[in-house]
């Protein structure tokens, strides 16, 4: 799967991103419905108003997420770009060329917009992604991920270039941190506690 994405040209990747943007807007009602489940659970569990605001998605915020994807399409494709080069004394020229990492794992907390941000950034750079969001945004994250998986398939990519960890337990998260055989890079996005846990277990 990662090889298919790694060799995909800019046009195909941008077409998939455009499909994701369109699908997010088209399915905004579905996303909001899933998000309402997360908000109801958050209120029940006594989540602070400020944290609930981070968690909340409405039509305008979904439009903002889709707009960010549209902006990503406009950016230059970094893959294949030559950063610099040098000529060795024997005449051999050595250059640094940007290539995809492979499979990137993302562990993040309660902001559901990160699900779309992470997946689309990975797609633009030719990387497959495994997403593990916070349990507070489980329904929102899962819904957004399913929409994106369908969108990339419609654009001609395998669904599995975007994967979602369905289990939000700490044990599974810790296991993901240790998957160095399958992950080429692990990125934590969150508070000090998350960063510390990743540093300890990765």
PLM region descriptions:
Residues 1-94:
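N-terminal Rossmann-like NAD(P)+-binding subdomain of aldehyde/semialdehyde dehydrogenases
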Residues 74, 83-202:
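Rossmann-like NAD(P) dinucleotide-binding subdomain of oxidoreductase/dehydrogenase enzymes
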């Amino acid at each position: 799967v990662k090889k298919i994405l790694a060799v995909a040209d800019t046009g195909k990747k941008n077409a998939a991103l455009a499909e994701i943007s369109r699908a997010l807007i088209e399915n905004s009602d579905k996303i909001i419905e899933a998000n309402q489940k997360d908000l109801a659970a958050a209120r029940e569990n006594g989540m602070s108003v400020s944290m609930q605001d981070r968690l909340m998605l409405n039509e305008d915020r979904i439009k903002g997420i889709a707009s960010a994807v549209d902006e990503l399409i406009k950016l230059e494709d970094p893959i294949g770009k030559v950063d610099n080069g040098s000529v060795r004394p024997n005449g051999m020229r050595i250059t640094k060329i940007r290539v995809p990492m492979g499979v990137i794992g993302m562990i993040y907390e309660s902001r559901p917009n990160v699900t779309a941000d992470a997946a689309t950034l990975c797609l633009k750079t030719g990387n497959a992604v495994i997403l593990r969001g916070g349990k507070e945004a489980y329904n929102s994250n899962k819904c957004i991920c399913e929409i994106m998986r369908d969108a990339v398939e419609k654009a001609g990519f395998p669904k599995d270039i975007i994967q979602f960890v369905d289990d939000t337990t700490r044990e599974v998260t810790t296991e993901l941190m240790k998957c160095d055989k399958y992950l080429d890079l692990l990125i934590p996005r969150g508070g000090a506690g998350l960063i510390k846990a990743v540093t300890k277990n990765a």
